[in-house]
Amino acid sequence: MAELRSNMITQGIDRAPHRSLLRAAGVKEEDFGKPFIAVCNSYIDIVPGHVHLQEFGKIVKEAIREAGGVPFEFNTIGVDDGIAMGHIGMRYSLPSREIIADSVETVVSAHWFDGMVCIPNCDKITPGMLMAAMRINIPTIFVSGGPMAAGRTSDGRKISLSSVFEGVGAYQAGKINENELQELEQFGCPTCGSCSGMFTANSMNCLSEALGLALPGNGTILATSPERKEFVRKSAAQLMETIRKDIKPRDIVTVKAIDNAFALDMALGGSTNTVLHTLALANEAGVEYSLERINEVAERVPHLAKLAPASDVFIEDLHEAGGVSAALNELSKKEGALHLDALTVTGKTLGETIAGHEVKDYDVIHPLDQPFTEKGGLAVLFGNLAPDGAIIKTGGVQNGITRHEGPAVVFDSQDEALDGIINRKVKEGDVVIIRYEGPKGGPGMPEMLAPTSQIVGMGLGPKVALITDGRFSGASRGLSIGHVSPEAAEGGPLAFVENGDHIIVDIEKRILDVQVPEEEWEKRKANWKGFEPKVKTGYLARYSKLVTSANTGGIMKI
């Protein structure tokens, strides 16, 4: 074991004042000289994925003490993307990731901890803590709060939060009545935990396993299961071993590890937000990773599992089928799909970790020779509409559609788009453009779950494409193309599109183009008046000035 970092505040005559303060915080004489462990929690009452994390913090601290460490718990902020959806609150969601990363870095660096247990769960909390872990680079393990159980209607049909969002669109289209919508509302979110489909939170918690920063089960053991509490205890104890072996996050998160994370993402059809967050993680880890490389991973990794919102299979079903380790083990049977020699938090390789984890239900995790598609569930599109890339969740596209052409229907905000969709300004075959909703323009790159849910609920899901410099909830599905870079607020091509322009989306060829004569296009660019920030004060104003486009992970300029 390396020399303890905490010696900086515990050892020597000149540290008597520091020890005096530590004694006041409950540190005993025999604790000096033991590893000081940061327990980075994200308990918060208003987020259902986090209401139970206070109990998990207690379990972690008990396990740390039993294993010979001294735990110190602190908390981060958190935003519930579902509750923040559809109003100004969503502008704060992605920016909260940076606050979380900064706050964790601040607390841990200021107090010279020797190791860290991160207890995240929902959308921006996990990536924020991951980013901080890369910056601090002390032995760290991730322990998510676990997924919510799927809801069930009175007829036994499994549902989730996305069912409720889509139910609103269905009700407004006259497809269901008020009682049916009320039933979806009552039963869509039956327990604590991260929402029950392969949405952003669960995607990131599963990717933490593939990255090697969490033990098997992190992404799939239900929040309310006794197995989850035992998992929390086991993970905390593992951290003490990781400290003894002096394994740090940057030893684990390499190009190979990020390839593995995206390979899992492709196999499970994870949220498009994983691209944004993993690119930000790579940046903090000092790893160069391009969007083109993501397409290379997609070319060699098949799509093996289709989960909600793309199907009626939920995270609980994935767990029963063997979880992430089983999916990775199945994937490992294809040569070159994974880097099996990648290091994990236990000191074992990924190959050693997943060995023997066989698939228990091939209806949930398809066998390698019977994939949903030969290519992975995410794709990066390029073209004159997205010179620096755009992301689509191919695993969420219905009916195997790979190409769409149609006229643009342009909206300058999500609110404007929602109004237009509800008032039938969008029809079959159209390409909806929602711009000025990127990291700078939004500000905060809000999720477009409400517009996509309206489109699906009104029966237009497979018949309309939606393109935005904003992003999508993991609960979104359909021909939803986000993260268009550079964004409109930066003078990206999306700013110059007009109603009726012919748009081409070709998933197979990875193309996103607009067909406008060059002379006309240059005229539009010359006439563009620039972007006026929507928010002039507070954190969002600072964020808007400092943030970069989605192709960099939406990170802040230094």
UniProtKB/Swiss-Prot annotation:
- Indicate which residues the UniProt annotation says bind [2Fe-2S] cluster: C122, C195
EC no. given is 4.2.1.9
InterPro entries membership: Dihydro-acid_dehy_C (IPR042096), DihydroxyA_deHydtase (IPR004404), DiOHA_6PGluconate_deHydtase_CS (IPR020558), ILV_EDD_C (IPR056740), ILV_EDD_N (IPR000581), IlvD/EDD_N (IPR037237)
Q: Does the keyword Signal apply?
A: no
User: What's any one GO cellular component for it?
Assistant: cytosol
| Similarity field | Belongs to the IlvD/Edd family.
The record's function comment reads: Functions in the biosynthesis of branched-chain amino acids. Catalyzes the dehydration of (2R,3R)-2,3-dihydroxy-3-methylpentanoate (2,3-dihydroxy-3-methylvalerate) into 2-oxo-3-methylpentanoate (2-oxo-3-methylvalerate) and of (2R)-2,3-dihydroxy-3-methylbutanoate (2,3-dihydroxyisovalerate) into 2-oxo-3-methylbutanoate (2-oxoisovalerate), the penultimate precursor to L-isoleucine and L-valine, respectively.
Quaternary structure and interacting proteins, as annotated:
Homodimer.
Q: Which HAMAP family match?
A: IlvD
Q: Which PANTHER family match?
A: D-XYLONATE DEHYDRATASE (PTHR43661), D-XYLONATE DEHYDRATASE YAGF-RELATED (PTHR43661:SF3)
Protein name listed in UniProt: Dihydroxy-acid dehydratase
Q: Origin organism of this chain?
A: Bacillus subtilis (strain 168)
